[in-house]
Amino acid sequence: MQLPPLFVERIRHQLGAEEAEGLCRALDGEQPTSVRLHPVRGEQARLAVSRPIPWSERGAYLEARPSFTLDPAFHGGAYYVQEASSQFVERLLPADVEGLRILDLCAAPGGKTTLYASKVGRAGLVVANEIDRKRVQVLADNVRKWGLGNVAVTCGDAETAARME
């Protein structure tokens, strides 16, 4: 990937030459594929895991990117393909989230929504709102595939969602 020269110049100024060079190499390199395993069905996934994601209880980096669309475990919700950085929100949740209610305002395609649903358990509730009608179906499909039954999918603006009880 060719980074814009102005960006490279700016980060060299802000970070120094050595650190900027390291960042450019990282941005230019191939990013590892990561997944998050379902809390119940995760053992059904037959994936070549290279290492766990340190900040995610059920997250893992894969040795190589498989053809997910050909994997029945993927279609059965045994795991969710999700960038490791998106799984960091797990660290931001309180230690005891069992039974909490969470509002996810920009929920599609559903990665963080299913993460929240796994953490709050059956006693909790996640309201997954997506303002873009074109993206709601993908969200609903991913929530259905995850199958925990503690997520309500809505389509509205933040003001409408804020009035929900």
Residue ranges and their predicted role:
Residues 1-165:
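S-adenosylmethionine
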